[in-house]
Amino acid sequence: MMEAEEQPWKTTFYSKLPKVELHAHLNGSISSNTIRKLIAKKPDLKIHDQMTMIDKGEKRTLEECLQMFQIIHLLTTTPEDVLMVTKDVIKEFADDGVKYLELRSTPRGEDATGMTKKTYVESILEGIKQSKEENVDIDVRYLISIDRRGGSSAAKEAVKLAEEFFLSAEDTVLGLDLSGDPSAGQAKDFLEPLLEAKKSGLKLALHLSEIPNQKTETQVLLNLFPDRIGHGTFLSSSEEGSPDLVDFVRQHQIPLELCLTSNVKSQTVPAYDQHHFGFWYSVAHPAVICTDDKGVFATRLSQEYQLVAETFHLTQSQVWDLSYESISYIFASDSTKADLRKKWSHLKPHF
């Protein structure tokens, strides 16, 4: 009985905790409320919201999760759709106590509606701008995603767009994300555009070691010295892990973006208590808790922090430190980091 009474208070701690979200795919972060608004605009598609979300206790294969994105893409085909989605997602993160957010999304053109990759990016930037003008209490930046399925030519196009907006979008576009189906393409296809991006001053967040048996692929990407690693699920696992890869990541102190619900629901990790957060936390390696796709996986960042705390027996003080330390891994400037640290200090409860 006591535990049930404590639960709302505990939940309040996690939702009030100021948080940084560094691994959030825009289209995967669309809530069921927003999905319903999009469905209402396109009734002929005969899509219902259960086709885009994995409920509590349910699981899908990674492949099935990726297929859900195809459905979501059918719903976001105009600049107006993208603008609405961006604003809704930003507001929902802010409502969950997220104070700094790096959204990521692959620029997408739609011949039928006339949306180009450039207007897609502009719609996201407009959503960020309007949210700021409406005083939503969150600092939002954008990473342009390279979808592995698009191959080298789409990657080069994404880098060009990122370079263009990096110079013109007032510090909003900060870097690139390499993501999409981890079995599509090869790392070497993306080396040239990613190196070009690095030379331009863009930051790199690379999904790697998401699936087993990718040691060579992982090493190729690590040789780029990415600024952050997405998932890194099999870097440290006893069956597939490689001590030299782990040593490389530790030696270069490359932060990991870790997404518990996503990994368990997509079955790349068998159970929460076997999540690789445990390994990296035990060696005091930089790691940041993230949602990945809060819409698809029906989660919130406060829920992810609660999961981590309860699974790995962290105190409130340790949870606070985990959140505070994540400020160090953002792609924005040192002055932004200093502002966020001030904000955290101001909001810090007495433990």
Swiss-Prot record:
Broadest EC class assigned to this enzyme: hydrolase
Entries under CDD domains matching the protein: ADA_AMPD
Residues annotated to bind N(6)-methyl-AMP: H25, N27, H73, S105, T106, P107, R108, D147, G180, E210, D292, D293
Important for catalytic activity (site feature) positions: H231
Catalytic residues, chain numbering: E210
Binding, Zn(2+): H23, H25, H207, D292
Keywords, alphabetical: Hydrolase, Metal-binding, Nucleotide metabolism, Zinc
Annotated catalysed reactions: N(6)-methyl-AMP + H2O + H(+) = IMP + methylamine
MF terms (GO), sorted A to Z: adenosine deaminase activity; metal ion binding; N6-methyl-AMP deaminase activity
GO annotation (BP), single: nucleotide metabolic process
Enzyme Commission number, as recorded: 3.5.4.-
TM ranges: none
Required cofactor names: Zn(2+)
Cofactor note: Binds 1 zinc ion per subunit.
Assembly notes: Monomer.
PANTHER family cross-referenced by the UniProt entry: ADENOSINE DEAMINASE (PTHR11409), ADENOSINE DEAMINASE-LIKE PROTEIN (PTHR11409:SF42)
Job description of the protein: Catalyzes the hydrolysis of the free cytosolic methylated adenosine nucleotide N(6)-methyl-AMP (N6-mAMP) to produce inositol monophosphate (IMP) and methylamine. Is required for the catabolism of cytosolic N6-mAMP, which is derived from the degradation of mRNA containing N6-methylated adenine (m6A).
Family: Belongs to the metallo-dependent hydrolases superfamily. Adenosine and AMP deaminases family.
Protein name stated in the entry: N6-Methyl-AMP deaminase
Origin species: Bos taurus
